[in-house]
């Protein structure tokens, strides 16, 4: 899901002008997110995967972030509340920082530069947990798997509204 491209020095800025801020960057803030979502019908999961909106959130982390936020991945961006936006900002940073500390997620073949597997997959709340019980206390929902933008999407059918 990546690519390698060689740029002339002057072409580099054109490329980065079309890439959104990283979620750990201060530019990924409440005002930025709010302004991006105004009148947008696209679902929130698609936005989190859109590198023009925010760079660096992949499919696994988008599902996990939305679970922590208690947001249904099919919810349209224009219907996202200010509280939802605060949660998206907060939990994007939280999930990604946890994943970094755990060395990433090794599902099949991911290894770090020293050849070690990541360990964040042991922390998954929804990703690859289809038909299992939700891990939130007092939630009796089941984890569902559906597809958004041809990507597997995992969510709790009860606590993600």
Give the location of each predicted region.
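Structured catalytic/nucleic-acid-binding cores of DNA maintenance enzymes
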Residues: 1-161
